[in-house]
Amino acid sequence: MRPNDRTASQIRPVTITRNFTCHAEGSVLIEFGNTKVLCNASVTEGVPRFMKGQGKGWVNAEYSMLPRATHTRSDREAARGKQGGRTLEIQRLIARSLRAALDLKLLGENTIVVDCDVIQADGGTRTASITGACVALVDALTWMRSKGIIKTNPMKHMIAAISVGIYKGNAIADLEYTEDSEAETDMNVVMTDTGKMIEVQGTAEGEPFSIEEMHEMLELAKHGIRELFDEQKAALN
């Protein structure tokens, strides 16, 4: 039995609000239950030095949590003078996932930076960030086309992500904090809307997991991500 009375495959209610702020070219507030993340996509001319002259664009991401996004206040990383290892890992995951969704040649020598700021955390912040960032990216690309910056839509796939895990011996989808903190296994899965995997990150926190359990978790992830694609499409329509 899950603490929230959800079934093993049941994801939390998802809300995607577009145009949440007025300045960013793409702005989305995404809510996975009590987890809330603001995803802003900003377009700038030019690319990082290592990309210059290649005729391709670039997508990067930054991730942070507000000091009181969690049960107790955490200092801002800026106050500590550097980003933590977890933050760096998550923003690289978000950026890699978004780049896999695009044909960078069609972006021209332009950069899109997606800022994912966690307003409230209750598990699954990185997967919510990826799912919301994808919608913000779509809106930023639409803006670029409307301004004549690009001629063709570079988006190859929609992408979405979900957490799955083993909790009290059972495979479950979309872990909230109380489940995540006690899970024997925690896995994050990023997929395209064509059913292909972009990234699978899985770690046994307690007991090692079997191949059969891994397959069960991946099936739950596929089922949950299909629902997330439906939510994205509904928001974009």
Curated annotation (Swiss-Prot):
GO molecular function terms listed in the Swiss-Prot or TrEMBL record: 3'-5'-RNA exonuclease activity; tRNA binding; tRNA nucleotidyltransferase activity
Pfam family, one: RNase_PH_C
Matching SUPFAM superfamilies: Ribonuclease PH domain 2-like, Ribosomal protein S5 domain 2-like
Entry annotated with the keyword RNA-binding: yes
EC annotation from Swiss-Prot or TrEMBL: 2.7.7.56
Family membership noted in the UniProt record: Belongs to the RNase PH family.
Name of the protein: Ribonuclease PH
Binding partners and assembly: Homohexameric ring arranged as a trimer of dimers.
Purpose of the protein: Phosphorolytic 3'-5' exoribonuclease that plays an important role in tRNA 3'-end maturation. Removes nucleotide residues following the 3'-CCA terminus of tRNAs; can also add nucleotides to the ends of RNA molecules by using nucleoside diphosphates as substrates, but this may not be physiologically important. Probably plays a role in initiation of 16S rRNA degradation (leading to ribosome degradation) during starvation.
Keywords, sorted A to Z: Nucleotidyltransferase, RNA-binding, rRNA processing, Transferase, tRNA processing, tRNA-binding
Top-level EC class: transferase
GO terms classed as biological process: rRNA catabolic process; rRNA processing; tRNA processing
InterPro entries, sorted: ExoRNase_PH_dom1, ExoRNase_PH_dom2, ExoRNase_PH_dom2_sf, PNPase/RNase_PH_dom_sf, Ribosomal_Su5_D2-typ_SF, RNase_PH, RNase_PH_bac-type, RNase_PH_CS
Source species of the chain: Pseudoalteromonas atlantica (strain T6c / ATCC BAA-1087)
Binding, phosphate: 86, 124-126
Annotated coiled-coil segments of the chain: none
Reactions that this protein is recorded to catalyse: tRNA(n+1) + phosphate = tRNA(n) + a ribonucleoside 5'-diphosphate
